[in-house]
Design a protein with these regions (language model features):
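Structured catalytic-domain cores with a bias toward divalent-metal coordination
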Residues: 1-447
Length: 447
């Protein structure tokens, strides 16, 4: 009993010291709605090759509005021309065609009609997309900012996109592609059933077909690119999504670690292809959950053998990659109670006393940027160098089991380069008429 009281006293004293140091280092921020004024604080990151902007939940308005304000600033003032988000490639491609004023562009409402969840079908994203379309309107096509998806949960849509492309440019190859993809036809509506059905097989009956189709498409790339390079790029990426998704759903029932790593490797590979396609000076912004954009090596994920796109960017780009985490103490969030359940507006529990969030809450700064990347920040880094709990809320939120369901250990100053803090937050606003449907695009992790 005495030992536990001593330990608690020491923890409390350490947290108080860390809070004082964080308070001194934190820069108060205006509201994200003060777009330009808010965005100016992030000019310091404008020289980066890749800026990764996180979120501690998939349903917090302030995170989306802050990322939008930062992104506008980086696009307008610092030459960023790629926005890659934690969404499926085929869904994001529809938005990309809209914002870059491509032929047969849909209306903005049509462009959003197929997003599967509140994660992207919300007013905050809609408003940013309308801004991006207006920004691009008077620019040369080669200078317009693109909107791309990094994720892999579009097996059926990506198959359809490959076939539609080949029907236009190479009908004979389209017939062969239909035969190669035919094995997956029974599973397209619910690919998780495919993973369950093949989990005891040494080799998937569908693997050879999807690999062969990707290879066939790439073998003819010189012919296809001469016709329409952008359309081929989209088709080839959809074929890669099919290949990765087929593998992912097989791994899903065998190893959560391996399936997570496959997914984030695909995200990073997609990013590098986007940068290469834009040329050597291209600069990208990423929107994804903290669990993807922070350096996994500094978290319990990495200690258990998982990696993510943030760690891959750190390894590939060094200091030219900037990893910015986001956090909150309390408020409301859009999430579901169970997998496939309806969206609910839930109350977020105040952060645990032994968490990083509690340290930032006790600074009594409502909204702040804490940047430990530059200058003499050794005292700040030392104060936050001890592993502490950090909260992650995905598509699902279970406040009754929050400690087990949503907290993990991390060293925040190694996980991120900077941290954006909102003491109290509110849920995103779903688009009018929007409804969550279909398999969530974060299955099976909720992040």
């Amino acid at each position: 009993m005495v030992d536990s009281l001593v330990a608690e006293t020491l923890r409390s004293r350490g947290a108080d010291e860390a809070t004082a140091i964080v308070r001194a280092a934190s820069e108060p921020l205006p509201s994200p709605d003060e777009g330009e004024e808010f965005g100016e604080f992030f000019d310091r990151f404008g020289d980066a090759k890749v800026v990764l902007l996180g979120e501690a939940t998939h349903g917090t308005s302030q995170f989306y509005r802050a990322r939008a304000a930062i992104t506008r600033r980086l696009i307008e003032k610092h030459g960023f021309t790629i926005l890659a988000v934690e969404a499926d490639w085929s869904d994001a491609a529809r938005i990309d065609r809209y914002v870059r004023h491509h032929a047969r562009e849909p209306s903005s409402e049509e462009a959003f009609s197929r997003f599967p969840t509140w994660m992207w079908r919300n007013v905050e994203v809609h408003d940013f997309i309308e801004w991006l379309r207006a920004h691009n309107e008077n620019l040369p096509a080669a200078s317009r900012t693109e909107f791309r998806g990094l994720d892999i949960y579009s097996l059926g849509n990506s198959i359809a996109a490959v076939l539609a492309y080949l029907d236009r440019v190479d009908p004979q190859e389209a017939k062969l592609a239909r035969a190669r993809y035919g094995c997956l036809t029974p599973w397209q509506d619910d690919p998780s059933l495919y993973g369950r059905a093949t989990r005891y097989l040494d080799k998937s009956p569908c693997e050879d077909g999807v690999v062969a189709e990707l290879r066939a498409l790439l073998d003819k790339r010189l012919v296809y690119v001469r016709r329409d390079g952008d359309s081929f790029f989209d088709a080839a990426q959809n074929a890669r999504v099919v290949r990765t998704a087929e593998h992912y759903y097989r791994l899903m029932y065998r190893s959560s670690k391996d399936s997570w790593n496959l997914r984030d490797r695909h995200m990073f590979d997609t990013l590098t292809r986007l940068l290469a396609a834009r040329g050597g000076e291209a600069k990208a912004i990423i929107w994804a959950h903290n669990s993807h954009i922070g350096n996994a090596a500094a978290t319990a994920m990495g200690w258990q053998g998982e990696f993510n796109i943030g760690e891959s960017c750190r390894s590939a780009f060094g200091d030219s990659a900037v990893l910015i985490g986001f956090g909150t103490d309390r408020g409301t969030v859009a999430a579901a109670s169970n997998w496939g359940g309806p969206m609910e507006i839930m109350q977020i529990n105040p952060a645990r006393p032994d968490s990083y969030e509690r340290i930032f809450r006790q600074t009594f700064v409502e909204c702040s940027l804490t940047d430990w990347r530059r200058g003499n920040k050794s005292e700040l880094c030392d104060a936050l160098s001890k592993p502490r709990l950090e909260r992650a809320i995905g598509v699902i939120y279970r406040p009754d089991t929050e400690f087990l369901s949503h907290y993990f250990e991390a060293v925040i100053t190694e996980q991120f380069d900077a941290y954006v803090w909102f003491e109290q937050t509110s849920a995103v606003t779903p688009l009018a008429g929007g409804r969550p449907h279909g398999a969530p695009d974060t299955y099976p992790f909720g992040l």
